[in-house]
Design a protein with these regions (language model features):
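Aromatic-lined ligand-binding clefts that engage carbohydrates, nucleic acids, or primary amines
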Residues: 1-59, 76-80
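Long, cytosolic, alpha-helical-rich C-terminal regions that act as interaction/scaffolding modules
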Residues: 5, 21, 74-79, 83-160
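Short, solvent-exposed alpha-helical "recognition" segments
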Residues: 159-165, 213-221
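Short, Lys/Arg-enriched anionic-surface-contact patches
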Residues: 161-183
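Short alpha-helical "recognition helix" segments of helix-turn-helix
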Residues: 197-202
Length: 221
């Protein structure tokens, strides 16, 4: 209680949400790294980035689009179970490769120092699918609960429940963007509308707005 009180319900809600881009995401991934790594090998990692396994903007012809529905990509992309640490600055062109190619050309060269990242690729050497990312998300949540001494889950939110919640708040959630939507979104963003204002105008959550702007303009948040 008091200054150092810890609200388990808020924490559980946060770590199950779209966590990428939040200030504490890197700290949580480093806590997982500390849990998995031999402490005698702990060192300064130097340049470190957070990478999406399922990429943020996969090509329409990619295996990612075949394996994941649009709703599944929207749900999983920015969650902690789809994130890992790499020992270099991100490379967008390599980051969008299909899983097997990405593993060989990108990750095998850049995750050598990270036990937490190695664990993912040793556990899932063949494919990254909705089933495997869900399984990894559940494992990571359980590991974080152990790290923070949470004995039983406050609330575990599954994919279908989350989508229902989103649609009840944002009626356009998971609906396709039209060409006119895109033009209007970019125009309003360039006029200086905030992400929160755009979310209200387009009846979509802030993550969806940021993701669409990123795809249309290359803007990084």
């Amino acid at each position: 209680q008091g200054y150092y009180s810890f609200n388990e319900h808020v924490f559980m809600a946060n770590i199950q949400s779209e966590i990428y881009g939040r200030r504490y995401t890197y700290a949580l991934l480093m806590l997982l790294e500390y849990k998995y790594k031999d402490k005698s090998e702990w060192k300064d990692f130097g340049t470190t980035s957070i990478e999406h396994i399922l990429p943020q903007n996969p090509k329409a012809t990619s295996q990612w689009v075949k394996d994941f529905s649009k709703e599944q990509r929207s749900y999983y992309t920015h969650r902690i179970g789809n994130l890992c640490l790499i020992g270099r600055r991100k490379n967008s062109s390599l980051g969008n490769l299909d899983y097997q190619e990405k593993l060989k050309k990108y990750f095998e060269k850049n995750i050598g120092s990270f036990a937490s990242s190695q664990k993912i690729y040793q556990t899932y050497p063949n494919a990254w699918t909705p089933e495997t990312v869900k399984e990894n998300q559940e494992r990571v949540i359980q590991d974080l609960m152990e790290i923070f001494g949470i004995k039983s889950p406050s609330t575990i939110i599954d994919e279908s429940t989350y989508m229902e919640q989103q649609r009840s708040v944002y009626p356009n959630a998971y609906q396709p963007w039209t060409e006119s939507d895109d033009e209007r979104l970019v125009a309003l963003y360039n006029e200086g509308k905030s992400i929160s204002e755009l979310a209200q105008m387009f009846l979509r959550n802030r993550g969806a707005i940021k993701s669409r702007i990123r795809k249309l303009t290359g803007e990084r948040f």
